[in-house]
């Protein structure tokens, strides 16, 4: 069976790898010069199932209003001139009830825990190295109110069997010794010992090499012009003046997947949520985290790689705007200087931004469509790295007709009531991802 995977970020590359492991002939089409060159390039570095929490949550509407007037707010909404932006926001607000939050968090935890297990198996099988650390992660609370909210939230962790430790202020240095310098700013923390960290881009580059060794063909610098469909099936991909045909197709274009598939009558509720990061050369190991610390107030993570510190987070809803904004850099600098002062040469940092493909319920869209040979793997939001291996394995199982190891039907596009029935004739989808 020949499968074409569209996109070579961490999601597309893991999908290609797992397909090849199951014996498929795989071709990956990518418009950039190599894998992990966009959203997977500079993310926060967390593989954190325990922090798989929906952005759509009780209290978020009121918080969003307050954040509009804060200088270092974790969320900013800027009109992009489209009606779709407001429709997407309305759908997100509809998911802010306690009931929807509980359902969505369970889905996210289920996939994220499975994905971490898949990553561990892959690491054992291949020996892949990507500056990973398996020392857990620590969410930091600056206020008693945040601590109390965490106590309410851990009920879901207990239901899903996720180990955790709720730490008061004085116990924080037992998990992260460098925090002894910042205790006066903190109320406590939530430690998740089974979470991990690592450089997503390095992982993706190495996994692409391992996929090539299994026979996967990567075609870079390819501008995908569209999909042709006939009789309820994808007939081929138009790229560079030629049509490439396969038995099955997997769309993993991240934030651009929605625009690519709309001409086919597939309305994916995916919106680009802009995030930022700094990658800082480490200068004082004793002042740096041993793993990841996550500032709950600013929604910013500070992650330790080998000789670098990655500071990433925040969310802007502003369409496909990729401009770097100095105000966001200052927020990242504020957090790292506050929690890990003197740990790195902040003035030498690489400043980066990327677009995370987010759904209104924060759960990715994985699985079949109304076209019998077209599958989706997108919409992971801020958890693409966390969920990548599990998502790739699920899609590979579905494409190859195998029973997935976990429930996956509620991750499909059909949960939104979208798609309908494929019609006859010829339809074309265009990849307008400039």
Swiss-Prot record:
GO biological process: D-alanine catabolic process
Cofactor(s) annotated in UniProt: FAD
Keyword check for Flavoprotein: yes
SUPFAM superfamilies: FAD-linked reductases, C-terminal domain, FAD/NAD(P)-binding domain
Residues reported to bind FAD: 3-17
Entry keyword annotation includes Oxidoreductase: yes
UniProt EC number: 1.4.99.-
Enzyme class: oxidoreductase
The family this protein is said to belong to: Belongs to the DadA oxidoreductase family.
Job description of the protein: Oxidative deamination of D-amino acids.
UniProt protein name: D-amino acid dehydrogenase
């Amino acid at each position: 069976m020949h499968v074409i995977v569209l996109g070579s970020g961490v999601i597309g590359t893991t999908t290609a790898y797992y397909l090849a492991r199951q014996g498929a002939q795989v071709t990956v089409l990518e418009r950039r010069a190599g894998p992990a060159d966009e959203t997977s390039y500079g993310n926060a570095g967390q593989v954190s199932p325990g922090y798989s929490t929906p952005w759509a949550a009780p209290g978020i509407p009121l918080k969003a209003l307050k954040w509009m007037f804060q200088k270092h707010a974790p969320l900013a909404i800027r009109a992009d001139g489209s009606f779709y932006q407001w429709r997407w926001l309305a759908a997100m607000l509809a998911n802010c009830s306690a009931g929807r939050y509980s359902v969505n968090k369970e889905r996210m935890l289920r996939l994220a825990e499975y994905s971490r297990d898949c990553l561990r198996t892959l690491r054992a099988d291949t020996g892949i190295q990507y500056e990973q650390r398996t020392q857990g992660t620590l969410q930091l609370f600056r206020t008693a109110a945040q601590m109390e909210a965490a106590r309410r939230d851990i009920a879901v962790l207990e239901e899903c069997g996720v180990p955790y430790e709720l730490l008061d202020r004085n116990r924080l240095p037992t998990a992260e010794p460098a925090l002894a310098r910042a205790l006066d700013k903190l109320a406590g923390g939530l430690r998740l010992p089974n979470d991990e960290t690592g450089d997503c881009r390095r992982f993706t580059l190495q996994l692409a090499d391992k996929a090539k060794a299994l026979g996967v063909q990567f075609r870079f610098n390819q501008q995908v012009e569209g999909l042709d469909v006939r009789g309820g099936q994808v007939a081929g991909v138009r790229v560079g003046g030629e049509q490439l045909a396969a038995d099955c197709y997997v769309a993993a274009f991240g934030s651009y997947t929605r625009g690519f598939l709309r001409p086919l009558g597939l309305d994916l509720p995916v919106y680009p949520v802009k995030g930022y990061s700094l990658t800082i050369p480490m200068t004082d190991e004793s002042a740096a985290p041993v793993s990841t610390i996550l500032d709950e107030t600013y929604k910013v993570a500070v992650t330790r790689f080998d000789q670098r510190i990655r500071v990433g987070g925040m969310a802007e809803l502003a369409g496909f705007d990729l401009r770097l904004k100095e105000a966001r850099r200052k927020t990242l600098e504020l957090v790292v200087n506050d929690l890990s002062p003197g740990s790195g040469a902040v003035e030498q940092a690489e400043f980066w931004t990327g677009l995370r493909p987010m759904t209104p319920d924060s759960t990715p869209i994985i699985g079949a469509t109304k076209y019998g040979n077209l599958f989706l793997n997108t919409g992971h939001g801020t958890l693409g790295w966390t969920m990548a291996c599990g998502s790739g394995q699920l899609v590979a199982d579905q494409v190859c007709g195998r029973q997935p190891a976990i429930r996956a039907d509620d991750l499909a596009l059909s949960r939104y009531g979208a798609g309908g029935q494929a019609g006859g004739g010829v339809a074309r989808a265009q990849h307008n991802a400039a």
